[in-house]
Amino acid sequence: MTYRNANRMMASAVLLTSLSAMSHAQKPPVPEQDWATRPVLRVWPGPAPGSETDTRKESTMHPPDSATMHIVRNVTVPTLTVFQPKDGSRSKTAVLICPGGGFRLLAIDQEGYEVADWFEQHGMTAFVLKYRVAETPPKDEDFSPPNMPMQEQIKRILAPLPPDAVPHAIADGIQALKVVRENAAKYGYSPDRILALGFSAGGGVVTGTMLAPNPADRPNYAAPIYGALLGPTPEIPKDAPPAFLAFAEDDPLVQPMVLRLFNALRDAGNKPELHVYRTGQHGFSMTERGTSDHWLQELWWWMELFGLTNP
């Protein structure tokens, strides 16, 4: 698969994660007034490198056919939203969560805030990363006109990504890990117990961080869920972090890239864990779709293996 075709394939995941996902049974989203008042940390001390002259305005909107879910577009200022247990962290592990959205938007609820809320309720501090995404029309009605035929939506989504979209997102992920580690004492977790968890395109961000050439740029543990790097998998570092991978067998988008990553990790002696669910399609995250409903509990069991759920 060429890098360009991989880009187009991953970009089409936007429709599945952010548009068609609304037709599946979902758990209630985290109330807007809850996450809107949580602490927010800047990822970069100044303008994000490469975006110094970008004047786009970030936009949050409801996807078609959903009055409760949110997607975020035109992110140019990466941030971390903090979810911390009200009675303090019961575990010294922190989780960095990277939502998906084809590098064009962020499915911020079902692949971000809802996941962070789950970890918070289980005694862990979690951070939801808004990383930079490719430009989309500034007006919501131009991005997703109410009566636009699905074929036209697909045509828009499958347009080639800008060449800097993926590198910018990965750079934001690496810098976000630094910010999470810098805030370990403040929020009560260990800087060497950081799990990076990402979905779809966010799984690509996580994979980019776990394979970073500089060990200091990597998370301690990584969980790319139905996502991996676009194009060829780079050389696997000998000391790459332990990895938990998962996707659904009926997901037509990411099987080759996830299996390629799994095999590369295994060949490098990483001993990755892979879960392939019979049902779930692409973008199952916190929705109810079948056997994939249990991925989060299985991730928790994997974390127990490494002592990450302990105080």
Segments and roles (model prediction):
Residues 99-104, 249-250:
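Active-site glycine-rich loops that stabilize anionic/oxyanionic intermediates
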Residues 165-239:
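Primarily recognizes the serine-hydrolase "nucleophile elbow" in alpha/beta-hydrolase
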Residues 143-185, 297-298:
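Alpha/beta-hydrolase active-site loop
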Residues 109-127, 263:
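Short amphipathic alpha-helix adjacent to the substrate-entry channel of hydrolases
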Residues 91-100:
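Short beta-strand element of the alpha/beta-hydrolase
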Residues 266-311:
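C-terminal catalytic histidine-bearing segment of alpha/beta-hydrolase fold enzymes
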Residues 220-276:
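The feature captures the conserved acid-bearing segment of alpha/beta-hydrolase catalytic domains
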Residues 27-89:
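N-terminal cap/lid segment of alpha/beta-hydrolase-fold proteins
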